[in-house]
Amino acid sequence: MSLAETFTKLAVTAAQAGISATGAAMKSAQSAIESAVEAVTGTPAPDTTQAPLDGPPDLDHALSDFANRAARIFYFMPPSASAVPAALESLANAVSASFRHVDLRNPANFTRLPLALGTMLTDAGSRALEGIDAIGAPRYAEFIRYAVQIFSEFPVYVTLEYRELIERQQRWLVDHPDDSITRKELGRAFVKTGRYAEAAEQLTRAAAGDVSIRSAALHEAGVAYYFCGSYSEAIAAECGALDADSENAPARFWLWLAAQRVGGYPFDVPEQHRMEIKTGWGETSLRYENIAERAGLDKTSGGRGIAVFDYDSDGWLDVAIACAHGGTSLYRNNRDGTFTDVSIESGIYHGVNGFGMAAGDYNNSGYPSLAICRMGFYGGLIELWRNNGDGTFTDVSAESGVSVWAAAFSCSWVDYDCDGRLDLFVCTNLGGLFDRKVQHKLFHNNGDGTFTDVAEKAGIISGWPAIGHAWGDYNNDGYPDLFLSNAVGRPQLFRNNGDGTFTEVTAEAGLDSPTLAFNAQFCDIDDDGWLDIIQYTWAIHEDVIYSMRNGEAPPYGHATRVFRNNRDGTFSLISSEIGITECWGSMSGNAADLNNDGYPDIVLGNGGPLVDRTEPMVVLQNDHGQFRNVTFSAGLPLTGKGHGINCADLFQDGRLIVLCATGGAYPGDLSTTAAFAPSERPGNYLAVSLEGTTSNRGAIGARLKLVAGGREQHRVVNGGSNFGCMPPQQHFGLGTLETVDSLEVWWPGGKIERFVNLPVNTKVVITEGSDSFH
């Protein structure tokens, strides 16, 4: 670390400490004032976990809402003094909308206002400083521009407000036809809403009118042409963008994409604009083909989470996909290599605008239900859809007590107290630059179909927004622990104390190094019987392109992080040691033995919210503990925005199908679900399905140890991580081995059972308490 970097880090740390202390003091004072006001008036603070019908319910959230609205107003305001009156009128309307349920003439609210403003600003400042620490000063300004863009634009484009925005820009250009910047923004708005031909026209005109934006405008025109299928025009536009600015890395990437569409790469591309790819060509025996259309899984949507589970309990795995711009999709396995879309008749289609989802049999009925996080950044109600056992689902969100309002990205089922009933955890983020952090939710299963949020009581308290999380028993004490993958900054590890409470042990575990990340999972990557942690990091597009061109991350980049469990309560970062050295925009990922050689591989679903942010999904093949990128060698050409990544033996033939739900944040950026199947079974295997009796029915949290050929393999039944959940059925690759020496099952309640003489190339079902399998 350079001297300048050292001083920057020290300054950031000191500022963080100061802001944290100031924020704590302000929050304490605010709490005291609120208690005093409640004592005088007899009116408690409003409940902020329920969805506001037509505006924020209290002063804190009203102030944050107004700050977010103001940021959007100034973000979209044309760069002209003549636009100021309209902006001021919009600000006045924003005050009315944000403070609809808050009477600022009330002395109590007036007294609270300065402290509410102070706590909002200290929260935002603390997050900003954490971002500098995580991202680094060289990339921070670019990241801030990115954050301002997505938080300003998402609320507009997820609603019909974008129509008003487009009309306002069009009216402005009638009177100001030479305003190339507004014309560029109009073209970008057309791209985001799927009006690609109009977008290309406006962006090309903007590029011709202002040399300062020529490269950026021509690049986005190239993206619009690409989506139109006009690949030659896309090539010309991206070449023009690079002529204007040879450092425009996204333009070089899209030129690479477009030229391949017409078979002209690299020779039809000027030499100075070519992009040599130095990664993804590692040696592998895997050869994939996309079977989504043939299997009936090729639905076009804004795909997010994927849950693979047996919803009708017929022994075959089915698929559910959460869609950001539509209803949830459910596909029934026909047992013949195809699926039938049963979304509407099952009722699950009404679970709209889903992001994260998880399947779990919370009432131990034998039929797993679905929990869905809705709307992500935009904020929505958590939903619980009970499986009725007859092919249909019923929304029981309100009556079960889980219907709370949050900007939630991921959820999971876990039996954290090992009482045989699945509990539900919901991980929350932010819905705007100035949003207040909503506490994560740990819903304890009361055993009567209802849940109680015990997160604060249990000690799971975090002031940081998180996108992903994972549960796993890292210290082998029989109780699942929680890892939070905080979006910007340090992750957090909460150790389960076994008494219903948790203790944060991040620093002492050696996990307090900051990064920018989406999701995570516990996985025994080295099969030593101790769970390791994979944290899927997210990089800006330029760093991804650098990795593609150089085969490694830039000096300031963050590769996928693998933390090895040291078996003493601590972890060590070993990514570079095991060959994981590239930056990707990983929004999802999973580990599974794709080539059946007995070693877990890693699949990354990559991309980003912006329309021009697309990149390949990545396969990192594990060769006896060393990983290599085999993406292109294996025939995985998919470029897009990979959210839910899942690996499952859908056809019970030993081939793990790689499922990828893709789609962007904007309504014009949809794509089609992919399902990549190996051309042939790569090796022998054993599939194991567990049924709990005293443990939860789906055996979530169970650990399995298989011994074959002189080595161990370890698996854990997961109740959800990333944007979705892996199947409860566990897959063991055996290579050329034809015998299994033994299989041990460690049930969540502590019982251990051992089985011998198991067959290969088949699925076995083990019921807790039984001395045999079938």
Report the location of each language-model feature.
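Calcium-coordinating acidic loop motifs
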Residues: D310-D312, W316, N334-R335, D361-N363, ...
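Short, conserved, GDST-rich strand-edge loop motifs in beta-rich repeat architectures
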Residues: C427-D435, T537-P555, G605-D612
